[in-house]
A protein has these predicted regions:
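Structured loop/turn residues at beta-strand edges in well-structured enzyme cores
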Residues: 89, 107, 142, 186-187
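N-terminal beta1-alpha1-beta2 submodule of the flavodoxin-like/Rossmannoid cofactor-binding fold
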Residues: 1-125, 210-258
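Short, glycine-/small-residue-rich phosphate/pyrophosphate-handling segment
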Residues: 124-182
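Short, structured loop/turn "capping" segments at alpha-beta junctions
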Residues: 119-124, 157, 186-190
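Oxidoreductase and adenylate-handling cofactor-binding alpha/beta cores
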Residues: 174, 179-190, 194, 218
Length: 258
């Protein structure tokens, strides 16, 4: 199978760098074909702007959505964007690996999403009607593909627990897993999380690579997170709110997981 690893850390000799190399070796050892988008090494341009289209802005002002739509539809995107889209088409699974910085992904990775997820490619896809509101949240260009996060953080696991000061890690990652991955159609696997990264020794690193290796081995067999499909009957259309009989006692992010 084909696996794309999108990696965001500025230091090749970091823990993240070592784990990235381990994941690539493990995947290749089990017969998978791997491509790596090392965003810092690529000097990836993180800001979405009019230069993402070979035609520049279409009117007097730059319109991020409409200019993106025009560039994608007419083959006028900048080469770096088109290249990453080709990698996504090629991949059967995508891994996003990054350190948790200020409760989200590094800006360079967010910029990868913003620029590569063009109108007509990752959003603005499918019909809109009284029963179907676009191909998204379980449908879309990435449907049938898998995705997983590998995330490191310096905080303790308890800090990210149900009553932890930072908030539950599933809530922190929800905009990424549900919004950036499930939205265009990926089946999203539970993330692999590494806490207290400053407290690392040889024995702990060995345990982590053993666990991570098992997760990588199960990339195409593990059960995905049970996010509710937008167009499968759980949501009222076009309001896109859960119907009254669906998870009536729940609200917030948890309500959108079956």
């Amino acid at each position: 199978m084909n696996v794309l690893l999108v990696y965001a850390h500025p230091e090749p000799k970091s823990l993240n760098g070592s784990l990235k190399d381990f994941v690539v070796r493990r995947l290749e050892a089990t017969g998978h074909v791997v491509q790596v988008s090392d965003l810092y090494a690529m000097q990836w341009k993180a800001s979405l702007d009019e230069n993402d289209s070979l035609d520049g802005k279409l009117g007097e002002r730059f319109d991020p959505s409409l200019d993106s739509k025009h560039a994608y539809k007419n083959g006028r995107q900048s080469e770096d964007i088109a290249r990453e889209q080709d990698k996504l088409r090629w991949a059967d699974a995508v891994i996003l690996q990054f350190p948790l910085w200020w409760f989200s992904m590094p800006a360079i990775l967010k910029g990868w999403v913003e620029r590569v997820y063009a109108y007509g490619f990752a959003y603005g896809v499918g019909e809109h009607s009284d029963i179907h509101w676009g191909d998204r949240y379980g449908e879309g260009m990435m449907a049938g593909k898998r995705a997983m996060l590998i995330v490191t953080t310096g905080g303790w696991e308890s800090h990210y627990g149900a009553r932890g000061i930072n908030g539950p890690i599933d809530d922190i990652l929800f905009p990424i897993q549900h919004g950036m991955l499930y939205y265009p159609g990926f089946d999203v696997l539970p993330p692999y999380l590494i806490y207290r990264t400053s407290r690392m020794d040889t024995a702990r690193y060995a345990r982590i690579t053993e666990e991570l290796g098992q997760r990588v081995d199960e990339l195409f067999t593990a059960a995905p997170i049970g996010f509710r499909r937008q167009n499968a009957g759980a949501y009222s259309i076009p309001a896109l709110t859960l119907k009254d009989d669906v998870a009536p006692t729940l609200s917030g992010f948890a309500a959108h997981v079956a």
